[in-house]
From Swiss-Prot:
Source organism per UniProt: Saccharum hybrid (Sugarcane)
Name of the protein in question: Large ribosomal subunit protein bL20c
InterPro entries for this protein: Ribosomal_bL20, RIBOSOMAL_L20_CS, Ribosomal_protein_bL20_C
HAMAP family per record: Ribosomal_bL20 (MF_00382)
GO terms of molecular function: rRNA binding; structural constituent of ribosome
Function: Binds directly to 23S ribosomal RNA and is necessary for the in vitro assembly process of the 50S ribosomal subunit. It is not involved in the protein synthesizing functions of that subunit.
Family, per entry: Belongs to the bacterial ribosomal protein bL20 family.
GO annotation, biological process: ribosomal large subunit assembly; translation
Entry keyword set: Chloroplast, Plastid, Ribonucleoprotein, Ribosomal protein, RNA-binding, rRNA-binding
SUPFAM superfamilies in the record: Ribosomal protein L20
Protein's cellular compartments: Plastid, Chloroplast
Cellular component GO terms held in the UniProt record: chloroplast; ribonucleoprotein complex; ribosome
């Protein structure tokens, strides 16, 4: 069987994969088969973790809001705060509430007073 010399297309594909693997170490940086496997695995992980990151941040914000509401006696729990916010139709997302709870807890009191006074 005759040997088929690969053209520039295969070389271009490998150099593209190498550019993705530029920060890897050892055989993962040097061997083409290992490079393709590790780059594919890295892409799978990054795709999975983009969705996971959204869940993790939401959990972090909820934890921060819950801790602040209990420490500063704004409400008894996070769920009561969110329930009253939605009932009074105040539109504050969890990210904003967490920032307020961490950086300026006094504003959390003003938000809770708004919830209690609006009828």
């Amino acid at each position: 069987m005759t040997r088929v010399p690969r053209g520039y297309i295969a070389r271009r594909r490998r150099t593209k994969m190498r550019s993705f693997a530029s920060n890897f170490r050892g055989a993962h940086l040097r061997l083409n088969r290992m490079i393709t496997q590790q780059v594919r695995r890295a892409f799978v992980s990054s795709h999975r973790d983009r969705g996971r990151q959204k869940r993790d941040f939401r959990r972090l914000w909820i934890t921060r809001i819950n801790a602040a509401t209990r420490v500063y006696n704004v409400f008894n729990s996070y769920s009561k705060l969110i329930h009253n916010l939605s009932k009074k139709e105040l539109i504050l997302n969890r990210k904003m509430l967490a920032q307020v709870a961490v950086l300026n807890p006094n504003n959390l009191y003003t938000i809770s007073n708004k919830i209690r006074t609006i009828n």
